[in-house]
Amino acid sequence: GRNMDIISAKRLRELSGGGVRTPMGCRSFLQTWTDETGKEVNAGRMNLGVVTLNLPRIAIESNGDKELFWKTFEERVAVMKDALLYRVARSREAKPENAPILYMEGGWGRKLGVDEEVNELFKNKRATISMGYIGLYEVGTVFYGANWESDPEAKAFTLEILKRMKDYCDTWGNEYGYHFSVYGTPSESLTDRFCKMDKALFGSIP
């Protein structure tokens, strides 16, 4: 479903260049996209999925060593890239007849013929694919202790993590023709799962 966020409308206009977006589901927004005529298009677009980075695990494994943190970060991002491209490839394997309402009846903004490639709806950054993350606050806690929000160095470090993710997404988007986005994964169940997995590996960390 889509939910209108009245409170955020003013800020959404600033971020989008004038338009107001409604999120897909709870918290996922599509970027501004225009078709070949220059018309802005929102309806009928889609997200091809998300792969989520467990940031607290990288921070814990680095044991306070930022150089090791960034090295591990780069390694995990490389794995994420492969996983995201796999999601795109699997999506492209679909046939219009697999989901006629979406592909052939206009649910995704255009009516494809039975023999057309579904990638016609995805390419040129019409579709998004998301690099998700969980636990940015906990990364700050590992390196700077609790209540680090007012520490300029801590804030700069956490923002640098997001910036590097965004830089990767921009590079991949230009290389592959899909809109790679940075996405604060809104999944309470995955947060709980990651936490349980990390606790099993590292124990309780005060």
Ranges and model annotations:
Residues 1-125, 146-147, 151-206:
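Conserved catalytic cores of very large enzyme subunits
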Residues 129-142, 163:
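Contiguous, well-ordered alpha-helical segments that form the cores/surfaces of helical PPI scaffolds
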